[in-house]
Structure formats: structure tokens, C-alpha cells
Amino acid sequence: MKSFCKLEYDQVFGKENNSFSFLNHSSLYSHQSELANPFFELEDEMLPSATSSNCFTSASSFLALPDLEPISIVSHEADILSVYGSASWTAEETMFVSDFAKKSETTTTKKRRCREECFSSCSVSKTLSKETISLYFYMPITQAARELNIGLTLLKKRCRELGIKRWPHRKLMSLQKLISNVKELEKMEGEENEDKLRNALEKLEKEKKTIEKLPDLKFEDKTKRLRQACFKANHKRKRRSGMSTPITSSSSSASASSSSYSSVSGFER
């Protein structure tokens, strides 16, 4: 019975020796697979083998993570606001913005005012004539610019345009002082040398008028000598008046007047 069953099994399924083997057909299969799919070797290199132990990790390899609580964003914002103070910071920010706006407004107004003043002063300085400026020769140039309501630089520029190289304030004041000294000498001398002193005064007045018209004109040599003689006479009179008696002071004044008179006579010549 057993032999019969074995015989049927061998007839149906074949013997073990004649069993189908993949090894016998491996060369054919590999040749056909290479012809059908030329990238088969590349896939073998890139894809890992299914039997590798690193392909899938076991569940036991994962560590148990602790339970994490969700982060409260509201509480974090509340902490930040409590530290820095949201209300005070916004107030400071608004104050800073308002101060910055005020400063920008003041700077813009100052710039606009400066432009308007420069434009107005430039227009005024261009309309100034030499006759108008000559009325302010007897005061310093800074005061003249203030009186004319223009800048000092613009006044100097306008003077250069009109041919006035140097402001004649000191020159005219020196000449005015010389005229006053000659007038005092005329009072001291009396009627003796009245004509000569009057002629000297007339010449000095003419020279003053010419300097007003031509500010760059220099003094004459006779005017310089007369000015120096009057200065020396006044200095001697002041020095001896406090040191000596009235008799000596009168004599010294007479000598000083005589020296100045000699200079006046030289001025007439």
C-alpha cells in the first residue's frame, strides 16, 4: 500500500532527482532580465536587501519619551509684558514720536525762515546804492549791517561791488577828531590866527567830503603831520595839567598851542 501511494506520488509530482531547480535556469533568467531591464544591476546596488537587519527597527529600540505639556503662549506674553511694562513703553514711545515731530517741525521752520531771510537780504543788498551806504560810514560796519537789516557778508560783498575795498569808519572818525582839535585850538588862540585856522578847517572839511565819496582815498601828508602835532600837543597838555601849577600849565598850553599853530601854518602852505 505504501509502495503504491509512493508510486502515484512520483508519477504525479515527479521524483526528487528530477525536481525543477532555479539554479539550472539562473543563467537564462539573468540573461533575459539583463536584456529586458538594463538598469537591474543599478537597482540592486541602490536598493537595500530585504533581509538586512537595518531595514526595519524593532519597536523595542524606541525610547519612551516623557509627557510634555503644551506651551502656553498667553502666559509667555503676560510674563514679557509684566517685565517690560507695556503701558509705560507705549507712553514713552508716543512721547518720543511727538518730540521727534516737534523737532522736525522746528528745523523745517528754521530752514524756511533762513531761506526767506537770505532771499530778502540778497534782494535788499542789490538795491543798495553807494549814496545810501555812505550815510552809515560814521558807524562800525557791524552796526551798519544791523541798521540796514542785511547780513555782514552781504554788506561787504555789496561794498566790493561798488568799489569800496575798506570800510572808512576809522578814517572818518580820525578826521573828525582832528577837526574838533583844530576848533579847540581856534578858541585858545583867539582872533590872532583865526583866518589861518579857519582855512585849515575848510580844507579838512573838504577832505572829509571827498573821503565820503571816495572811501579808498588816503590822507594827505599835511593832514598826517597836523594830526600828529595835535596829538602831541593834547598829550603834553594833559600830562602837565595834573603835575604842575596853574602858571606852568598855562605856559605849557601856550607852548603846545604854538607848536600846533606852526603845524597849521605848514598845513596851509
From Swiss-Prot:
The keyword DNA-binding belongs to this UniProt entry's keyword annotation: yes
GO biological process: regulation of cell division; regulation of DNA-templated transcription
Residue span, RWP-RK domain: 106-195
Alphabetized Pfam families for the sequence: RWP-RK (PF02042)
Start-end of Low complexity biased regions: 249-269
Main location: nucleus
Organism superkingdom: Eukaryota
Coiled-coil ranges (or none): 175-216
Gene Ontology molecular function, alphabetical: DNA binding; DNA-binding transcription factor activity
Keywords: Coiled coil, DNA-binding, Nucleus, Transcription, Transcription regulation
Region of interest (Disordered), residue spans: 230-269
A cellular-component GO term for this protein: nucleus
Cellular localisation: Nucleus
Summary of the function given for this chain in its UniProt record: Putative transcription factor.
Stated name of the protein: Protein RKD1
Organism whose genome encodes this protein: Arabidopsis thaliana
Gene: RKD1
